[in-house]
């Protein structure tokens, strides 16, 4: 008996020593663990790309490298769950074959993604384009991820009768198998994954014809259905709602608080990069940034009460140190070859054609969100609009007074070295025109001088709350003071010509403005941020309100002039300063030119001088509230005195 005990003691001691030496993790018997990899907002960035990160030029992203990382993780745990938070399309040349090849969705399937959802940019190709893309994915015969979205309001649409676009999408959803949620078995763990489309995402989808239920209420109902009908261990959500600095307006934080049964939210749409997960109650919110620059990785362990604890979390940089999977890269290259023949050939380009050599350090994309000032990246794009319109062989002779590029339409910057057609397209890669061809067209519109000043005020007062509304202009210069009262921050606003001459703006005069179609369509959202106080109404040259902005597309012999093509033409037009036969980006763009001047004065006179009608209104409202408060205080005091007198 003693011998057996000694043997047992020796065996246990050896086992404990082995565990310590080999660092084998010890978990309670029956404890369930889930490993998750995730992305969101990859925006057609199948290939790696060069951009500016923290002031340095780097090669980042790429599905071939992400495939390498996923395969490595799955070697350790074949049951790793792979999720995506939507906006997998619209951002590079590959989107030009979106509706015929479904390249993005097929590549997500090839990489081993389990579930994705729709972002606002999946609707950029309109109902027909989205429907065709889903059908192309099915017809490819390849493995594709499940798609979940729980808040499409088919009942409301069917009550009013489905229009043609809604019918097309409904048929495509049914054919693909789009669901409110999907249940996935990973090892010994059953996981329900809910998909949801956010409120702000809908605001950013002007061509979407679908109606949606309130995201929180829809997820709440779906989770209740899951708990009633499915025996699952975990409930995750792929959300295209986003997180924001203001917690009260942060959609996925609101979702976490109001639907506490969610264990994990993959948060897309806001392009947020969370180095630490956000936690509300027992719900974790994670985000890894845009364009596949990072692959999110986390592990969760089930606790005794059935809820889950995040035991590890990291954002893995998809850098040039990672070896790309060769078979994946081959598939990407084959898909990219179709772009040259099926799209760029119609414009007379190839994707690797060098348009200009660049020695200028342009602002990064991140700086457009963090710096509220003139940026050279916006300057060159807005100047390109003017050049392309006024140098078109179909130019009608009507000079462009102002060209406008909002930061929300800019998708990447230009690095030093050769700028190719692909680089230019990727910098402005959104949408589709009325002609059904990829790329938003430039449009003609007219605004009064008074409205031009309001546009400057939109930038000065609204864009800190909605950074996508930051405006970069050619022809319009203004100065603003960030310390002045909201809606009265602009202190100087005027027009300039090519020679720099200052021209005063006449309030009642109509001015010729060129911008892209998406910007025109998004005016409503920007105006909503000012609660209707700032109203811009695009007009035709006769001053009549424009009913359909698509009809204002600038045409060249029945073809739309695309915004990206305007930039490409401008790049190609630059002087060849080194004699090698290739244009060079001018030194002019190495500096700024007082197009947007920030006056940081806190002098009381500078803060209150020249009040406009908005500041007067705000002051009057504040005074009214002050008078009301004083009256209430006076009345309360009188009542208190009366009560005291009666009690004496």
Identify the function of each model-found stretch.
Residues 27-321, 384, 446, 463, ...:
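Acidic, metal/ion-coordinating pockets
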